[in-house]
Design a protein with these regions (language model features):
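Interdomain helical connector at the RecA1-RecA2 junction of SF1/SF2 helicase-like NTPases
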Residues: 172-302, 319-324, 328
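Conserved RecA-like ASCE ATPase "motif II neighborhood" in helicase/translocase motors
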Residues: 99-135, 140-149, 405-407
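Conserved C-terminal RecA-like helicase domain
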Residues: 98, 251-405
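Long, hydrophobic alpha-helical segments
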Residues: 443-532
């Protein structure tokens, strides 16, 4: 194990906190692997304390019991109910307190919570121990400030990160890269490896163009030419030049692109105003598209889906449209329930939306959730969607069909019962891979051959984003990541060809040498040829 080797060779006085990071794709058993690494170090006696840190939400939903199940002995894994208990176990010399599981939030508050009551000697005692921290899901940007605080509190500690989606120079933006924070990559098991080894499923991304490409192109061309109509744009020589430039795909592509000199060339979708993606007509089109394909994609309601939107107001708007048009679908939403009274009408709208969702949910499932207990409501929804806890053997009528979110549940949530992700949201790099990976947990291959993704907003831009993310996170080996429709396509072509042959045979024409004379046969051939 490269982590335990690194710990055994560590000079605890050189203040080098960067132990390295492990890149193991989402769904490959990363959390168990990271936990086992912590256990190996604890057993090796090369460190006084091994602290396994994760997000409090993950710790809350997956529970300490699960981690104790990984261990040989339940007492080998110590939980921490509060900051005081965490401090007590960090100071302890009892061998059973060597391996500690806690949240990164709790660990970051050690100094801030206790500085007034804690003797400097206590902090010094903890700092003098050989501490190893293993951070699960270390790519999360929310961990940034907390990790800095922990590193400052324990300057001699050694830090390791586990992630399915490291941050590289290509996608760092305001984030530091994973290497900057944790050091060198120690081991890699990319999404390409996971799919090829059949540990996770591949993806079937489907682009849905709510607006026809030519409609958008024409709209942008007329606006950029500063014309009031297409006729005016063509008739005026100055306007005409601009109009035809925007109407030419090689001049202005549908999606923007980065040129070799590092400059960004805008695409048609970059010129489209935001309200094109936020109006009722557009939203109803998506709601209808989801419902039209619901039985096919959900395999007759066996599987569930997540629908990620771009904002909370949009999530509420979509929820209401589903309830209005398709009340037979059981739909709910999850997002940050905080009500900011300074936001006025928007805060009221948000509160009304949450109350509506809770009331409908309560009516369906005979529960009594309210905003005050929203965190527990979220836990129940996640268990219902994952068929866990009390919902392991639930009946069909107790299932949830569709969960609408903004950012929640797009990372860290695992359910083999989710097979489809709908996106009215722009995602890139690690956020895209994390969201896609909600759909690719293994199930019976005949019923769930891949994770389905349908994306609507700025579809050509998203298509580029998908290609870029898959290239980066497959280690530049994106082949085999997507559903292979070739066998189905060949079978479909063979059937269409036989049907075309029958049209000519019926008209007594050998080898399709010429078209049949009668209009009906010509029309039938034309239809089959289009399908072919």
């Amino acid at each position: 194990n490269k982590i335990s080797d690194r710990v055994s060779r560590n000079d605890w006085k050189d203040n080098n906190q960067r132990g390295g990071y492990i890149w193991h794709t989402t769904g490959s058993g990363k959390t168990m692997t990271s936990f086992k690494s912590a256990q190996l170090i604890a057993n090796s006696k090369d460190a006084d304390k091994v602290v396994f840190l994760m997000d409090r939400k993950e710790l809350g939903s997956q529970s300490l019991t699960e981690y104790q199940g990984f261990a040989d002995n339940v007492d080998d894994v110590q939980g921490t109910d509060d900051t005081n208990m965490l401090i007590s176990k960090l100071k302890s010399t009892d061998p059973k307190n060597t391996l500690i599981v806690s949240s990164i939030q709790k660990m970051s508050r050690i100094k801030e919570d206790e500085i007034g009551r804690m003797r400097a000697k206590d902090i010094e005692d903890m700092q003098n121990k050989r501490l190893v921290f293993i951070i699960d899901e270390c790519h999360r940007s929310t961990f940034g400030d907390m990790l800095i605080t922990i590193k400052n509190t324990f300057p001699n500690a050694l830090f390791f990160g586990f992630t399915g989606t490291p941050v590289f120079s290509e996608n760092e933006k305001s984030l530091s890269t994973t290497t900057d924070i944790f050091g060198d990559e120690l081991h890699r098991y990319s999404i390409a490896d996971g799919i090829r080894d059949k540990n996770v499923l591949g993806f079937d991304p489907i682009m849905v163009c709510v607006y026809p490409d030519m409609e958008l192109r024409k709209k942008v061309a007329i606006e950029e030419a500063d014309a009031s109509s297409e006729a005016e744009a063509i008739s005026d020589p100055k306007m005409q030049k601009i109009y035809y430039r925007f109407m030419t795909v090689s001049e202005v592509p549908m999606a923007g692109r980065l040129l070799e000199d590092g400059t960004y060339q805008k695409g048609i979708e970059d010129y489209i105003k935001k309200d094109a993606w936020e109006n009722d007509k557009y939203q109803y089109s998506i709601v209808d598209n989801i419902k039209e394909n619901w039985l096919r994609l959900s395999r007759n309601n066996k599987f569930h889906a997540i629908f990620a939107t771009s904002s909370i107001p949009e999530a509420i708007s979509y929820y209401r449209k589903f309830r209005e048009k398709y009340p037979e679908l059981k739909v709910t939403g999850l997002f940050d329930p905080t009500i900011d009274n300074a936001s006025g009408d928007r805060a009221l709208e948000k509160e009304d939306g949450i109350v509506e969702m809770l009331n409908d949910y309560n009516n369906w499932y005979s529960t009594n959730w309210d905003i005050a207990r929203y965190a527990k409501f979220k836990l129940e929804v996640s268990e219902r969607l994952a068929h866990k806890g009390q919902f392991v053997r639930m009946k069909a009528e107790s299932q949830l069909d569709l969960l609408i979110v903004v950012n929640q549940m797009l990372t860290g949530f695992d359910s083999k019962w989710v097979n489809t992700l709908y996106l009215d949201k722009i995602l890139e790099y690690q956020n895209l891979i994390q969201a896609f990976s909600r759909t690719n947990r293994l199930f019976n291959i005949n019923e769930k051959p891949f994770g389905s993704i349908k994306y609507y907003r700025m579809p050509h831009t998203m298509k580029n984003n998908i290609e870029n993310a898959m290239k980066l996170y497959s280690g530049d080996r994106p082949q085999g990541l997507f559903a292979d429709h070739l066998p189905d396509n060949i079978e479909h072509m063979n059937i269409s060809f036989k049907d075309m042959e029958a049209v000519f045979k019926q008209a007594n024409i050998a080898d399709m040498q010429k078209l049949p004379d009668d209009t009906e046969s010509k029309a039938k051939f034309a239809k089959l040829f289009r399908e072919f």
